[in-house]
Amino acid sequence: MMRAVQFVLAGSLSLGTVFFGGCETVPQGIQQARIEMSQHIAAEPAGDYFIGRRYFKPDYKFWGYVRRPGQPWSTAELVMLNEKQKLAPDRERLDFGSDNNYEYKLYGSFSGDKVYEPASNGIYPEFVLKGYELISTNPPPIFKSQFRGNASPTDLRYVVEKPE
C-alpha cells in the first residue's frame, strides 16, 4: 500500500512538472512595453485610415497585418494588397521586403474581395491601398517570437504568426 502511495505521489509530481514547466512569466520590461503599446493604441484618434504592420516573408505574397485605429493588434487581418492605385512602400522603392515590421498609417479600404495566396494555401481579404504614411521603422513587438526574441528568421521562414 505504501509503495502505491509513493508511486501515485511521484506520478503527480512528474505530471505537475510537465504542466507547470510550460508556464512562462513575462519579463517586466516586456510587460511594460505591452502596457505602453495598449495605451498608445487606445489614444489613436478615430478616422478614415488603418494601421498596417508590414509582415514580409520571402515565399509569400501577402502584405502584412491591417487593423482599425484604436483596435488591438489581435483584431488585425493579414491582407493581400491591391496596388492598382498606389504601390506598396517597398515596391515603390524597388527594395522588396526592406520595410519588414515597419508600421504605417494606411489610406484605403477593404474591397470585400478575397484573394488566394498559393504559398500559404490561404485566402485573405484584399485591401485597396490609396496612400500611406510611415509611423515607425522600429515599432513595439506584436508577435510572440518578438517577445521571446529567440527565434531566427530561418526558424520562422514558413511560419505565419498572428499578432497578440
Question: For each of these PLM feature ranges, what is it?
Answer:
Residues 1-9:
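Bacterial N-terminal signal peptides that target proteins for export
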